Regions:
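Acidic-glycine-rich active-site phosphate/pyrophosphate-binding loop
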Residues: 51-58, 118, 139-152
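Solvent-exposed alpha-helices and their adjacent loops that cap or buttress functional pockets
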Residues: 1-2, 95-99, 128-129, 141, ...
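Hydrophobic alpha-helical hairpins/lids featuring a short glycine-rich hinge
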Residues: 85-130
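Active-site pocket-shaping loop/turn-to-helix segments
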Residues: 13-22, 66-84, 131-140, 156
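Glycine-rich phosphate-binding segment of PLP-dependent enzymes
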Residues: 30-32, 56-61, 115-130, 149
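ACP-dependent fatty acid/polyketide chain-elongation machinery
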Residues: 1-68
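Conserved small/polar residues in nucleotide/adenosyl-binding loops
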Residues: 153-162
Length: 162
């Protein structure tokens, strides 16, 4: 950073505990766990560990077009939802950002794992030619920062940090 202040003006959360900030905070304070038996995998019984923190009850169409939501990995959809919640929490207009003063920073170790799993299955069943050319773009973590940036009047400053 160059010594300038950063201001966080709004918060958004997509979590196994809750997908609304006030419910999430109440859950944290009360010690609620978001860990439970995995419901999103048909073959979960094959695995020795069958618990995880899954996102449930998120109406993604509140935050992005349903057609677009089907194209992107849940990692991206969840990030867009959380960013939208943060903008709303801040009381900001989606299209009123000063491109010179606003930016996006995403920190994540890895991105689109569900997309990777889907493409791995396609490769095993049909060979490498069945793998989507979107595999790498959907997996890399900076897809989310870029997607959010484009969604909000093409913010110039967008980064991804491990």
């Amino acid at each position: 950073m160059n010594g300038k202040e950063i201001v966080i003006t709004g918060l958004g959360v997509v979590s196994p505990i809750a997908n609304e900030l006030n419910l999430f905070w109440e859950g944290i304070k009360s010690g609620k766990s978001g860990i439970s038996r995995v419901e999103s995998m048909e073959d979960i019984d094959q695995f020795p560990v069958q618990i995880a923190g899954e996102i449930r009850n998120l109406d993604i169409e509140k935050y992005m077009d349903s057609k677009e939501a089907r194209k992107v990995d849940p990692f991206t959809a969840y990030g867009v939802a959380a960013a939208s919640m943060a903008v709303e929490d801040a009381g900001l207009d989606k299209f009123s950002f000063d491109q010179e003063r606003a930016g996006v920073l995403v920190s994540s170790g890895i991105g689109g794992m569900k997309y990777l799993q889907t493409q791995h299955k396609r490769a095993l069943e049909g060979g490498p030619k069945r793998v989507s050319p979107q595999l790498i773009p959907q997996m890399i973590t900076n897809i989310l920062a870029g997607y959010i940036s484009v969604s909000y009047t093409h913010l110039r400053a967008h980064e991804t940090s491990p």
